[in-house]
């Protein structure tokens, strides 16, 4: 330990001695610069220091500027340049000198020296900072639009160092780094994007460096805001005489000026003015002529703005012609005129006082006697006593309602006690409701009795039937026979038995349906199934308004037990016909109420079972009701009370219908208010124009007078209704008040109630299945058709599939199904209301037996001519006419083609115009000796398409035969008239030589690869060389000219491979270049994958582009000298006298005879026929439909759903040509009902609302435009 300390001390003493010796020797060494001067920038008049340090410290320091010694305080006492003890040069006040002289600015260095030597430091510059006064670009006043970009320009004064630019707004520094909309450009410009009104103000540009700062002149930024609506005018609906205000408020900077104009009409200046506070346009005392469009214009320096609103003027209905009272003898005709005007045009109806039935325009009763013309005239023919009463004509629109009443009095001969009453004819057997198949026959029996024998006539929907129709005949018994039924034969048929004593009627419906529908076909039972006649009714008790009857049941009940009885009566005081008692009668005794005092009555009874109605009993004795006591006094009081109530309820509109709101597909809620308090209102009738409810009611009775809203249910889905409310007073007789205004409403959509039609399931092979269908009828869609849902259920969960298509799809194809497995398939339509009912469950077993059955059915369907001839509804003459027209078209086309090319008829060559380019006036036919070895040529009839590596773009799928179509029928364009112009094929640069498919038409390749969802994507990937759209010049001929065209051009069918040979090598084409391929592999137990095929039409220019080319000619390439000189042969010419010489000399002589200026070639426009021929039955997808079947410009197939319009094997599409929503499927406007007899049969036609007794219903909406069209369906 001691030795270590001793050693350490010794080392330290040695080091100390060495250091001391070195320091003493350093003063004896040459100097060394230890601190060099650095660049300095200083402003004029400021001090500055240039440092310089050297070792040893005794070294002399000398300063130089720009290579010259610096005069310091050592040389000149009063110099402002001072050398410090450390050697640094201190400038007390930097001088800029005059005109650059005596300036302190320059390059400085110091020199350290002693007797041992000297050393020079690095140079350091002293630069003078400066900042000029004037800005190179001064800010200017800027006006900008709000929301756009504003630029305040500024270029700072010249200075050194470069001045830093900042900005002030309203004398406050802008912190641009904290303002995201502000940007300071490198050149000093201030950019505000987007500019806002808050940015308005005074801006100054500030330039700073070490010299100081410069502030620019102030510049004003004015931000103008374009006019913007705070409140746009809205459409207004007002009543005549009211005032209306169109509120139009606009903001902007400066405040916009507002002006009003009326579109295409003068402004009602005497009644229109700008409201206070400039709130809008106000029109006083609105008139119907004021209806129109009013436009609010707002304008300021930043721009203009306009908005319009429509004024709809409502005027309640008023009568131009009121109905007048009439007195008509029995059997005569009563006519009531009724004309109303209003804004909008009022809807009107007739009703008989005391009855709920509404008779709208075009109404025809079941017996045809009562009619309402489209103009509103009510006509009652063959007037009867029962027609007597008051008839009300009511008009209504959204503004209000009005009504007028007229009385009908029927005069008849009095029946005395000595004059026996002879009842009208009685119909023994009548027809029943029937549903029959199209093409079958119908017999409608009508056997009547009476003295004298009554005549029988028939009506359909209230109109006489045309017996002259060869299909319709009437038997001697009165029965109606209709052969070969058609759908227009559907309707309500009424039999009328008439003699001099009166008439009787019997009505029932006949419905005709296709065999493909799901309707239940019902034919009328044999009359032996009906009950026999009950016994003659016995009158037990008679009062002034009631009669009690007793009778016995019939001896035989027919094919079933008696379910009830029907009572009919005849009154000579009420009219010469039988009337029905509407009540349900279950027993053999009944008290009839509501009869008229002092009236005579006669009764008959009919029994009814579930099969139908039996024959009538013997009529009862004639009975007369009694006259009640104090009848006169009560009548006067009642009449007075009724008159008061009627005046108060009908003189003005008491109810205002405010809103009708849709609740769901079958229910709506009505809201109404009383315009004034009326104590006589005891309830309301809610009525409507539209289909009846499902329970056949056309109105709703609201019995509480305090109720102000009500839900009407059991309506039809997706149907338009027009509702109104009628108040009533329930006194001795019910009095109906004036109806309210009317309002329209559309019920919501519901799931389709009908399944898709014509669902077909067909096996293509043991693993492929095709499902096709047609859309259901329009009246069963219950909304807008959105598509279809196909459910496929296998025997294992991974074999199930749920496919959803759009509304235009008509089929799907399932691939890679499991052989031997049983699949259950359901197809249903869907709307916005949901998925509807399916067609049922179809089971398919994927085995050989099923396949053979399906293939046999397919072969039978392919016999198109056989099916056409056997269609009973297609006359042979139509087929002959079509064939004649077809032949005439072909002859005309051939004549036209020949006339176009008449100048080349002497040539033996064939004009080729199938995608090649017309290059010269007289080129000789050029073809390789071995075309199979020359990659430039390819038979135009074989439309193949190869990819870049030479392999076909068509690849085999597991079921290749499903995709292969024989292309022998689409042999290009080889057969063309002769012409002196000859053509070369245009080579496609960059592609294989034999890859020509009718020129360079753009090819689309469908990819039926499996997918797990219902969205399919169209593959548009193409080889790069297919995108080359340039025309390429033809290659020069390299072989001798043959004496005639090669055999393969003369007969394009020669040497063509068979279909099987092409299929075997994996190559084939479909529809002229449309290829199907699959990628990947599928396990046998994988879920079924679907594919839907598109049929793509090529555009007329052959490039695959979607540009329409109507009458456009292709511009040919510029001709060169080589186009007019025949190429030299590649082989020696043949011996003299060969036909080659004759051809060549002839051609050369003709060429020389043309002179120096060759004749211009005549170029045919590239026709559609020159490109890929597609299957004549093929159509573009429904998304690409356009004129000529070409896709719209700039549009692509909708890839969201590739459900296709697949073609049936018989050439037809499984989808209707029109869209599903376009189908005109009539909805039966008449509800099927049990047969009706007598006058109450007219209730069958109460559902015959609207025009021609049909429902006003929305038809399904078309997909191209999205507009709802309302029409009678």
From Swiss-Prot:
Pfam families: fn3, I-set, Ig_3. PROSITE patterns: FN3, IG_LIKE. Residues 1037-1046, 1125-1136 have a biased composition (Pro residues). Residues 1106-1115 have a biased composition (Basic and acidic residues). Residues 533-628, 653-750, 755-849 form the Fibronectin type-III domain. It comes from the Eukaryota. One of its GO terms (molecular function) is axon guidance receptor activity. Expressed in the AVG interneuron and the male-specific sensory neuron HOA. One of its GO terms (biological process) is cell-cell adhesion. Residues 1096-1105, 1145-1156, 1240-1273 have a biased composition (Polar residues). Residues 1033-1273 are annotated as: Disordered. It is a single-pass membrane protein. The keyword Transmembrane applies. One of its GO terms (cellular component) is cytosol. The chain crosses the membrane at residues 874-894. Required to confine migrating sex myoblasts to the ventral muscle quadrants during their migration through the body and for multiple aspects of sensory, motor, and interneuron axon guidance. This is Protein sax-3. It comes from Caenorhabditis elegans. The gene is sax-3.
């Amino acid at each position: 330990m001691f030795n270590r300390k001793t050693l350490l001390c010794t080392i330290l003493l040695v080091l100390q001695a060495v250091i001391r010796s070195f320091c003493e020797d350093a003063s004896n060494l040459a100097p060394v610069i230890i601190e060099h001067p650095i660049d300095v920038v200083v402003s004029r008049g400021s001090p500055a220091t240039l440092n310089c340090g050297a070792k040893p410290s005794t070294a002399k320091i000398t300063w130089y500027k720009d290579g010259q010694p610096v005069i310091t305080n050592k040389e000149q006492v009063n110099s402002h340049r001072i050398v410090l003890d450390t050697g640094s040069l201190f400038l007390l006040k930097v001088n800029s000198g005059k005109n650059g002289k005596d300036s302190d600015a320059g390059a400085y260095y110091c020199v350290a020296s002693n007797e041992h030597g000297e050393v020079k430091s690095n140079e350091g510059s002293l630069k003078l900072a400066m900042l000029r006064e004037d800005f190179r670009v001064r800010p200017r006043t800027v006006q900008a639009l709000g929301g756009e970009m504003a630029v305040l320009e500024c270029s700072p004064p010249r200075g050194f160092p470069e001045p830093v630019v900042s900005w002030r707004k309203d004398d406050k520094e802008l912190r641009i780094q904290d303002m995201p909309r502000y940007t300071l450009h490198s050149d000093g410009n201030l950019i505000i994007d987007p500019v806002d009104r808050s940015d308005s103000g005074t801006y100054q540009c500030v330039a700073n460096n070490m010299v100081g700062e410069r502030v620019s002149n102030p510049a004003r930024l004015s931000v103008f805001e374009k006019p913007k609506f705070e409140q746009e005018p809205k459409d207004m609906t007002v009543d005549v005489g009211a005032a209306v205000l169109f509120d139009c408020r606009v903001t902007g900077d400066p405040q916009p000026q507002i002006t009003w104009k009326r579109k295409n009409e003068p402004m009602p200046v005497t009644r229109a003015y700008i409201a206070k506070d400039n709130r809008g346009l106000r029109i006083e005392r609105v008139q119907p002529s004021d209806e129109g469009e009013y436009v609010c214009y707002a304008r300021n320096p930043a721009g203009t703005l306009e908005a319009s609103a429509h004024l709809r003027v409502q005027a309640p209905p008023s009568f131009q012609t009121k109905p007048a009272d009439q007195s008509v003898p029995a059997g005569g005709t009563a006519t009531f005129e009724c004309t109303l005007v209003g804004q909008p045009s009022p809807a009107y109806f007739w009703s008989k006082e005391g009855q709920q039935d509404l008779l709208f325009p075009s109404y025809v009763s079941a017996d045809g006697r009562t009619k309402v013309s489209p103009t509103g005239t009510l006509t009652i023919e063959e007037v009867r006593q029962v027609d007597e009463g008051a008839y009300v004509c009511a008009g209504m629109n959204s503004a209000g309602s009005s009504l007028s009443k007229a009385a009908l009095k029927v005069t008849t001969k009095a029946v005395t006690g000595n004059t026996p009453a002879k009842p009208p004819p009685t119909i023994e057997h009548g027809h029943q409701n029937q549903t029959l198949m199209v093409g079958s026959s119908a017999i409608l029996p009508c056997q009547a009795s009476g003295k004298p024998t009554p005549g029988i006539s028939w009506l359909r929907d209230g109109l006489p039937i045309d017996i002259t129709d060869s299909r319709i005949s009437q038997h001697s018994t009165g029965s109606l026979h209709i052969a070969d039924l058609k759908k227009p034969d559907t309707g309500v048929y009424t039999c009328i038995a008439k003699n001099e004593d009166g008439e009787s009627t019997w009505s029932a419906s006949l419905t005709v349906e296709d065999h493909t529908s799901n309707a239940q076909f019902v034919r009328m039972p044999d009359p032996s199934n009906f009950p026999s006649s009950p016994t003659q009714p016995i009158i037990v008790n008679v009062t002034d308004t009631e009669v009690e009857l007793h009778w016995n049941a019939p001896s035989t009940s027919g094919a079933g037990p008696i379910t009830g009885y029907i009572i009919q009566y005849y009154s000579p005081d009420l009219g010469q016909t039988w009337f029905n008692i509407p009540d349900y009668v279950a027993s053999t005794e009944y008290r009839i109420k509501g009869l008229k005092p002092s009236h005579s009555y006669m009764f008959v009874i009919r029994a009814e079972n579930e099969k139908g109605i039996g024959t009538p009993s013997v009529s009862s004795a004639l009975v007369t009701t009694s006259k009640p006591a104090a009848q006169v006094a009560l009548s006067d009081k009642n009449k007075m009370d009724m008159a008061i109530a009627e005046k108060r309820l009908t003189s003005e509109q008491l109810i205002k219908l405010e809103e009708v709101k849709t609740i769901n597909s079958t229910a709506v809620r009505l809201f109404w208010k009383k315009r004034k308090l009326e104590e006589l209102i005891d309830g309301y009738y809610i009525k409507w124009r539209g289909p009846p409810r499902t329970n056949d009611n056309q109105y709703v009775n609201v019995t509480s007078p305090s109720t102000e809203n009500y839900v009407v249910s059991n309506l039809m889905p997706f149907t338009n209704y027009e509702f109104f409310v009628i108040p009533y007073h329930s006194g001795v007789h019910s009095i109906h008040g004036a109806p309210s205004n009317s309002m329209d409403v559309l019920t919501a959509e519901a799931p389709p109630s009908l399944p898709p039609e014509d669902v077909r399931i067909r096996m293509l092979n043991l693993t492929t299945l095709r499902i096709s269908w047609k859309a259901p009828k329009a009246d069963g869609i219950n909304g807008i058709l959105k598509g279809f849902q196909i459910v496929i259920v296998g025997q294992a969960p991974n074999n199930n599939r749920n496919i959803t298509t759009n509304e235009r799809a008509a089929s799907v194809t399932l691939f890679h199904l499991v052989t031997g497995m049983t699949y259950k398939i359901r197809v249903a339509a869907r709307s916005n209301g949901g998925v509807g009912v399916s067609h049922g469950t179809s089971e398919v077993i994927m085995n050989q037996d099923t396949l053979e059955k399906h293939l046999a059915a397919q072969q039978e369907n392919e016999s198109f001519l056989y099916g056409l001839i056997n269609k009973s509804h297609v006359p042979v003459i139509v087929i002959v006419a079509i064939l004649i027209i077809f032949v005439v078209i072909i002859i005309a086309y051939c004549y036209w083609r020949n006339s176009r090319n008449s100048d080349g008829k002497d040539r033996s060559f064939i004009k080729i115009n199938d995608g090649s380019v017309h290059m010269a006036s007289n080129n000789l036919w050029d073809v390789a000796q071995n075309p199979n070895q020359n990659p430039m040529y390819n038979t135009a009839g074989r439309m193949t398409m190869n990819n870049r590596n030479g392999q076909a773009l068509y690849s085999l799928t597991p079921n290749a035969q499903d995709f292969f179509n024989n292309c022998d029928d689409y042999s290009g364009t080889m057969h063309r008239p002769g012409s002196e112009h000859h053509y070369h094929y245009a080579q496609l640069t960059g592609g294989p030589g034999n890859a020509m498919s009718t020129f360079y038409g753009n090819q689309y390749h469908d990819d039926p690869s499996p997918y797990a969802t219902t969205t399919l994507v169209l593959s548009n990937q193409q080889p790069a060389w297919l995108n080359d759209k340039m025309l390429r010049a033809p290659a020069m001929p390299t072989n001798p000219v043959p004496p005639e065209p090669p055999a393969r051009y003369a007969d394009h069918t020669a040497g063509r491979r068979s279909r099987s040979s092409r299929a075997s090598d994996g190559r084939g084409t479909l529809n002229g270049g449309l290829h199907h391929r699959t990628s990947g592999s599928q396990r046998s137990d994988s879920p079924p994958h679907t594919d839907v095929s598109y049929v793509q039409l090529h555009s007329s220019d052959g490039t695959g582009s979607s540009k329409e080319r109507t009458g456009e000619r292709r511009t040919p390439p510029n001709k060169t000298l080589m186009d007019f000189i025949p190429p030299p042969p590649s082989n020696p010419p043949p011996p003299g006298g060969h036909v080659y010489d004759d051809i060549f000399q002839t051609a050369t002589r003709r060429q020389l005879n043309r002179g120096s200026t060759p004749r211009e070639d005549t170029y045919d426009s590239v026709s559609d026929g020159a490109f890929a021929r597609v299957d004549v039955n093929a159509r573009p997808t429904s998304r690409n439909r356009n004129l000529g079947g070409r896709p719209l410009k700039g549009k692509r197939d909708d890839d969201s759903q590739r459900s296709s319009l697949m073609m049936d094997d018989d050439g037809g599409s499984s989808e209707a040509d029109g869209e599903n929503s376009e189908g005109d499927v009539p909805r039966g406007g008449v509800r099927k009902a049990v047969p009706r007899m007598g006058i109450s049969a007219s209730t069958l036609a109460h559902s015959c609302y609207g025009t021609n007794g049909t429902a006003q219903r929305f038809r399904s909406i078309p997909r191209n435009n999205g507009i709802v069209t309302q029409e009678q369906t």
